[in-house]
């Protein structure tokens, strides 16, 4: 069976008779500079490097129409000659009478002028004559008070005097200030004139010293800079240690000044009690003087007060070599702390707050409320806990001191009343009767 028989069975149309053209696959053009054999070896793989082909720059595709520009001449109004410049502007914006748009930035400075009469009355100076002063003011107008340019252009040979930048500034501002004060007294000046007068302040000596100081700073060597930084750090350390030492000293003196007697005022009524009080005061003053001398003669700022108290003062203490102590591991900056007692298990730091007497707890809470401090720590860190305990102890000490003062004042008041009654009755019969009742 042939293919024609099969087509007859399935009633298929006969095949079209004609030459079919094969579809040609598009071939890429071989680039210049590569041989045909080498290019055929590449196959479908592209070249590893882009091949540069010389061609002209493509013309930009602009969708809108090009704008027309015109080269227009313009003049500067601040110039008195006929000097003309040109610039490019849009043809639609061409205006022969329009001013130059950057002309608004050409603002001349206000420089005071003076007359011959004003110079003779107010501006005479032994070191400056009128011609040189006029020359200085002309340069200031020409160079808009740019004193570095003025000092560079200044003709020192003409007047046979070497003028520094500070000399030129001092002469200009002193003349301007004198003229302004002569024309407008201070009492009748406006706000603008007062502001202008304040801007004319110039201290020549201060500027000279400042520039010398800056020159000295700029001429330092790296070794000198490092030494100054080390000295500054050492100064900060000494100031910190000195502040801590003074606070410890005040605390020790406060402890030494505390009264030792708790028996009330009755123990000082007799001569023996008064003698004991005077002796205690003398001993307290001697102890205070010894502590101050020991602290002053101490050579180590970071040694603390305890070492000062434990070390006796000797006459040859100043001749002993000074010992310089370095940083200790227990300094706060290293973050190392030593706990006095470790509690077993987990505990809250607020549990370590010392308990207050029941008679004082309510008063302590009221004082802390007046100070705006909560009686319960919100964030009980180590520093907050320490400050809170310190505040609580200070309040307790204050309340105890107030109680003693009130008690002493009451006893004093009673003694005053008794003394007045005794003085009222010579024999003291009324006072004895009053006491017996």
Swiss-Prot record:
GO terms for cellular component: NuA4 histone acetyltransferase complex; nucleus; Swr1 complex. Residues 1-33, 302-328, 408-437 are annotated as: Disordered. Keywords: Activator, Chromatin regulator, DNA damage, DNA repair, Nucleus, Transcription, Transcription regulation. GO terms for biological process: DNA repair; negative regulation of transcription by RNA polymerase II; transcription initiation-coupled chromatin remodeling. Residues 1-10, 408-418 have a biased composition (Basic and acidic residues). Its main location: nucleus. One of its GO terms (molecular function) is DNA binding. It comes from the Eukaryota. Gene3D superfamilies: Homeodomain-like. Component of the SWR1 complex which mediates the ATP-dependent exchange of histone H2A for the H2A variant HZT1 leading to transcriptional regulation of selected genes by chromatin remodeling. Component of the NuA4 histone acetyltransferase complex which is involved in transcriptional activation of selected genes principally by acetylation of nucleosomal histone H4 and H2A. The NuA4 complex is also involved in DNA repair. Belongs to the SWC4 family. This is SWR1-complex protein 4. The lineage of its organism: Eukaryota, Fungi, Dikarya, Ascomycota, Taphrinomycotina.
């Amino acid at each position: 069976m042939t293919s024609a028989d099969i087509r007859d069975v399935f009633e298929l149309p006969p095949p079209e008779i004609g030459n079919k053209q094969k579809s040609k696959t598009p071939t890429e053009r071989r680039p210049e500079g590569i041989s045909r054999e080498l290019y055929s070896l590449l196959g479908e793989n592209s070249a590893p490097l882009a091949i540069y082909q010389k061609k002209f720059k493509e013309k930009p595709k602009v969708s809108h129409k090009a704008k027309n520009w015109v080269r227009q001449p313009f003049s500067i109004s601040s110039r008195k000659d006929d000097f003309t410049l040109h610039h490019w502007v849009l043809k639609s914006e061409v205006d022969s009478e329009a001013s130059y748009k950057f002309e608004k930035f050409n603002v001349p400075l206000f420089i005071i002028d003076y007359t011959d009469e004003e110079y003779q009355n107010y501006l005479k100076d032994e070191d400056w004559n009128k011609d040189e002063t006029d020359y200085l003011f002309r340069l200031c107008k020409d160079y808009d008070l740019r004193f570095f340019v003025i000092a560079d252009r200044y003709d020192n040979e003409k007047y046979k005097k070497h003028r520094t930048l500070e000399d030129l500034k001092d002469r200009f501002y002193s003349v301007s200030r004198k003229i302004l004060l002569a024309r407008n007294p201070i009492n009748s000046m406006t706000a603008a004139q007062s502001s202008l007068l304040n801007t004319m302040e110039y201290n020549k000596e201060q500027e000279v010293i400042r520039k010398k100081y800056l020159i000295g700073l700029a001429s330092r060597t790296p070794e000198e800079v490092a030494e100054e930084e080390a000295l500054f750090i050492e100064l900060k350390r000494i100031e910190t240690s000195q502040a801590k030492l003074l606070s410890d000293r005040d605390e020790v003196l406060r402890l030494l000044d505390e009264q030792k007697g708790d028996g009330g005022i009755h123990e000082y009524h007799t001569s023996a009690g008064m003698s004991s009080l005077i002796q205690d005061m003398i001993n307290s003053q001697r102890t205070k003087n010894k502590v101050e001398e020991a602290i002053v003669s101490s050579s180590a700022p970071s040694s603390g007060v305890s070492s000062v108290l434990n070390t006796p003062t000797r006459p040859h203490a100043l001749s002993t070599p000074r010992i310089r102590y370095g940083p200790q591991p227990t300094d706060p900056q290293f973050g190392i702390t030593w706990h006095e007692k470790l509690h077993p298990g987990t505990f809250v730091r607020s549990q370590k707050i010392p308990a207050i007497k029941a008679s004082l707890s309510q008063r302590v809470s009221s004082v802390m409320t007046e100070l705006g401090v909560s009686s319960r720590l919100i964030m009980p860190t180590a520093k907050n806990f320490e400050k809170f305990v310190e505040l609580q102890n200070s309040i307790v000490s204050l309340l105890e001191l107030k109680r003693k003062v009130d008690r002493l004042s009451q006893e004093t008041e009673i003694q005053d009343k008794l003394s007045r009654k005794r003085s009222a009755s010579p024999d003291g019969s009324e006072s004895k009767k009053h006491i017996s009742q």
